[in-house]
C-alpha cells in the first residue's frame, strides 16, 4: 500500500485518484467513480467530491493507497 501525503485537511476523491497516479484525467476519475470501481475504506463510493482525510484508504483495480498527513 502506498502512502499519499497531503498538506491540507482533506483531498477530494477525484483529485486523489489523479494525484496518486491511479488515473490520468479528471474525466477518467469521474467515470471510474460513477461506475462504482472505487472503494473508500473498503466500501464502494460513487461521490467524486468525497473528502478523503488522513487514514482513509482508497482502492482502484487492485491498487490501494492510504492518505497520510503532511510533508
Model-derived features with residue positions:
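A basic, amphipathic helix-loop patch mediating RNA/tRNA/ribosome contacts
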Residues: 9-54
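Intrinsically disordered, low-complexity regions of eukaryotic proteins
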Residues: 4, 16, 30, 58-61
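A detector for short, charged/polar N-terminal pre-domain segments
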Residues: 1-11
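Generic structural motif recognizing short loop/turn segments at the entrances and edges of beta-strands
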Residues: 2, 36, 61-63
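C-terminal structural segments of small proteins and small subunits
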Residues: 44-71
Amino acid at each position: 500500500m502506498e502512502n499519499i501525503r497531503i498538506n491540507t485537511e482533506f483531498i477530494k476523491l477525484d483529485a486523489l485518484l489523479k494525484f496518486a497516479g491511479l488515473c490520468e484525467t479528471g474525466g477518467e476519475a469521474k467515470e471510474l467513480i460513477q461506475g462504482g470501481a472505487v472503494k473508500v475504506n473498503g466500501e464502494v463510493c460513487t461521490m467524486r467530491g468525497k473528502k478523503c482525510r488522513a487514514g482513509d484508504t482508497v482502492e482502484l483495480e487492485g491498487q490501494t493507497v492510504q492518505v497520510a498527513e503532511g510533508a
